[in-house]
Curated annotation (Swiss-Prot):
GO terms for cellular component: plastid; ribonucleoprotein complex; ribosome. This is Large ribosomal subunit protein bL20c. One of its GO terms (biological process) is translation. It is found in: Plastid. Belongs to the bacterial ribosomal protein bL20 family. The keyword Plastid applies. The gene is rpl20. Binds directly to 23S ribosomal RNA and is necessary for the in vitro assembly process of the 50S ribosomal subunit. It is not involved in the protein synthesizing functions of that subunit.
Length: 118
């Protein structure tokens, strides 16, 4: 039976894990089992945070657009409905940026909605 030398593989795997958990407190960065568990928990939490950030930013963009639109007498719902109906490809992030940085361009969009409604 041939001899299998796998010391380097295990050492490399542990080293990668310990670099991930290097800033953790106590045995969470020293012992392999607890570090492995905490590393997995950290990766799950970071993924959850990235997903949550997308939700939070979308809600923020909607609030900003709604505030800018309501100052001119239109609801957010009407704005989005008009954009879809006329195939204007502006997502919520871009609309929010236009509403903050370039009010004139944003109100041109709103004026076109008001003209169409009558």
């Amino acid at each position: 039976m041939t001899r299998v030398k796998r010391g380097y593989v295990a050492r490399r795997r542990r080293k990668n894990l310990f670099t991930l958990t290097s800033g953790f407190r106590g045995t969470h960065s020293k012992l392999f089992r607890t570090a492995n568990q905490q590393g997995m928990r950290a990766l799950v939490a970071s993924y959850r945070g990235r997903v949550g950030r997308k939700k939070t930013l979308r809600r923020l963009w909607i609030v900003r657009i709604n505030a800018a639109v309501r100052s001119d007498g239109i609801s957010y719902n009407k704005l989005i409905q008009y954009l879809y109906k006329n195939q204007i490809l502006l997502n919520r992030k871009i609309l929010a940026q236009i509403a903050i940085l370039d009010r004139f361009a944003f109100f041109l969009i709103i004026r076109s909605i008001q003209r169409e409604e009558g």
